Amino acid sequence: MKKLILLRNVMILLCFLTVGSNAWAKVRLPNIIGSHMVLQQKSKVKLWGWAAASETITIKTTWDTTTYKAVANNGAHWEAEINTPAAGGSYTITIEGENKIVLEDVLIGEVWVCSGQSNMEWSGDQDLKESINEAPHANQPEIRLFYVSKSTALYPQDNLEGKWVVCSPESMIHFSAIGYFFGKKINSSIKTPVGLINANWGGTPAETWTPAYVIEKDPIIKKGAESLGQYAWWPSNTAIAYNAMIAPLTKFSISGVLWYQGESNVSSYYSYEQL
């Protein structure tokens, strides 16, 4: 009887291992790469993800006839550079290995990150009058929004929570007002699709958004970081917002960054120029 129980347990374990192995073998993408995204125009942009070690990944787009290839390394990571045309779309990207992923409704245009503290975070769901008044007019199919969920980490992460959505009254009302109105202005002025990435957190000091190695190698910045107070309602430890909310974005090609910062660094004004 004991032998039968042992055999059953071994079989169950083998089943779990097989399922787990198959799951890791599948081609996967970080959340920043998905349907409805905007890719930076006229650039070599990186696409990346995970797959079984040594697996060959093929990438095809509908804006040209090139087939791009990448091979997953021993860490199960793959990466490829693809060429993007001038602004336009929508397009489809097909990524295939053991399984196939089809990214639909992809636009090519200008990509901006909206980061910093409270003035950048402010949105319609925080009773901002301008956003509330604008919301009924926010059906903007050429503006795409990616809202990064607030989180912290002790070490740089390779993925984050969030997904690309088409700008609508429902999605815009939760998004950075500064980011939205900036994107709307670009879109209307130069007739170019705009992708906006919302990664901000009210009250946070600049050191929270700065990589640890940058702080450690500069004695003035390090002194300012060590003088920061601790608060229950927002993070203030060095690098922890960067690790969770910015590090996973660093491979994604952008046009620029909208940044609001200052109030939480008043006490360490002497390091602000270096920051």
Where are these regions (language model features)?
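Bacterial Sec-dependent N-terminal signal peptides
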Residues: 1-28
